[in-house]
Structure formats: structure tokens, C-alpha cells
């Protein structure tokens, strides 16, 4: 709590008046980070014309997020880093899982416009999601968004390959 109040430059009572528990504070952090990413994605999405571009906008929004200036350098997905600190089945961990599921659902929604086979849509959405999250983990370890750029190119290759069959 002392670290949080010092970083936020607020009195402890202000923190206690706004959050009834540490869990509630963590939930607010996760919700804020999720909304931050959704806003980045929405800005990218507004510039797209095709379903393929909309899917790649998900990768671009992750790239944008990685490019933010971080005090201690980029260390990967803040939500996954936070989730690693939570016990299994905690509300914070579940909130992070829901965010990741929503990102995959966004990809699947756009894939539905490209592919007719719903099982294929589900499989490719999972594949792209794993590619996205794995590249974010590597980017965090390396402190560079280079892996996200490579993942975007790989995603584009997957989409080109899949869409020529449909």
C-alpha cells in the first residue's frame, strides 16, 4: 500500500475511501489496462477496410502498447505479469483470462468474415492468439517490440494461406 500511495501521490485514506480491498484495487488496474488496450485497438480498427486488416490491427495495437514509454522499460504484457502474481482462481486472474479471451474473440469475429468453416475460424483464432501472446512474452523478455513485428508478419502469412483456400 505504501508503494501504491507513493507512486499515485495520494494519501492512504484516499486509497481506502476509493477501494474497499487490495483485490478491488487490482481489479481496477486490470480494467484500466484492458480499456487502454481496447482504445488503442479501436484507433487502429477505424483505419481498416478489410477483415484481414482488422485482424492485423489487433497485432498493431499490441505493438502500440509495447511502444509506450515505461519507467522500468518494457517488460511484456502488464496483465500477464499481474496474473502471475495472483493465486489460481482469483478474481484478478479471471479478469486477465477474460481479457485474453475477448482479444481472441475479436480475432474470431473478423475471421468469420473471411472463412466459412466455424471450426477453422476457432482453430485459426487460437493459433493467432498464441502467436500474439507468445510474441508479447518474448518482447517483454527482450525489452523490444521486434518479436511483435515478426508475429504480425507471421499472422499475415497465416491469413494469406488460409484465405486462398476459401
Give the positions of each predicted feature.
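Hydrophobic alpha-helical connector segments
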Residues: 28, 42-71, 125-128
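Helix-turn-helix
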Residues: 1-28
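Short, basic, alpha-helical segments at the C-terminal edge of helix-turn-helix-like DNA-binding modules
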Residues: 31-38
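C-terminal peripheral helix-coil segments that are non-catalytic and often amphipathic
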Residues: 64, 101-113, 117-122, 138-166
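Cytochrome P450 catalytic-core helices
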Residues: 132
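Amphipathic alpha-helical packing segments from all-alpha helical-bundle domains
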Residues: 71, 89-113, 126
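Amphipathic alpha-helical segments used for helix-helix packing
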Residues: 69-91
